[in-house]
Design a protein with these regions (language model features):
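A secondary-structure boundary/capping signal
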Residues: 42, 80, 138, 155-156
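Short-chain dehydrogenase/reductase
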Residues: 59, 117, 135, 151-153
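A contiguous, mid-protein "functional segment" used to position or interact
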Residues: 141, 147-162
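Beta-rich strand-turn-strand
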Residues: 117-135, 140-144
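Flexible, glycine/small-residue-enriched loop-and-beta-strand segment within the central core
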Residues: 42-54, 59-125, 163-164
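Residue-level recognition of oxygen-bearing side chains
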Residues: 71, 129, 147
Length: 180
């Protein structure tokens, strides 16, 4: 509990989070399967046309939009306004058809492995795999797979650096994560 916070306020917020999460996944979004503790802040939306599988300790910041399917591991942090969107939402190359009247394309799910932090306002395109232990910077647009323990940022997202300075530490961390 944070210093200076009242126990009553903490307990009320905890109960409200449990109720919001239960409502979100058992009443509103039955297409979401979860396995463990999940925290969903206000305004987070899941597209009912896709399947979502969530691990343990997954937190969605306020106003996240998951508009394409996702398989998420354990210990995932999504800051506010993170978007999972489809690359193939609109078919635009059918002769004699407008984009408006064209059928929607198929989007593959996004895979987020264990121990990933996705910063505020990041956009992740469908079919992307975000490797274990990775960090996606605020505002990044991820159009390609992210390797394990990489820190990526920019538009399009590129590797800025790795969480660990040497390959041995990265390997040990990934092995430890695979046992979790």
């Amino acid at each position: 509990m944070p210093i200076g916070a009242s126990k009553l306020k903490f307990r009320i917020n905890y109960i409200l989070n449990v109720m919001r999460t239960w409502y979100c996944f058992n009443i509103k979004n039955k297409n979401v399967k979860y396995n463990g503790f999940i925290r969903v802040m206000k305004g987070t939306r899941f597209n009912p046309g896709y399947e979502f599988v969530l691990g343990h300790n997954v937190q969605f910041g306020p106003n996240c939009l998951l508009d394409t399917g996702a398989n998420m591991g354990n210990n995932i942090l999504l800051a506010g306004n993170v978007c999972f969107i489809g690359k193939n939402d609109h078919t635009f190359n059918i002769l004699g058809k407008t984009i408006w009247s064209s059928p929607r394309g198929k989007n593959n799910p996004i895979i987020v492995e264990n121990d990933v932090w996705i910063g505020h306002g990041a956009i992740i395109m469908s079919g992307i795999k975000i490797g274990a232990g990775s960090i996606v910077a605020s505002g990044a647009v991820v159009t390609k797979d992210v390797p394990p323990c990489a820190i990526v940022g920019g538009n399009p997202a590129r590797i800025i650096k790795y969480r660990f300075d040497n390959d041995e530490d990265k390997k040990r961390h990934c092995e430890w994560l695979s046992k979790q």
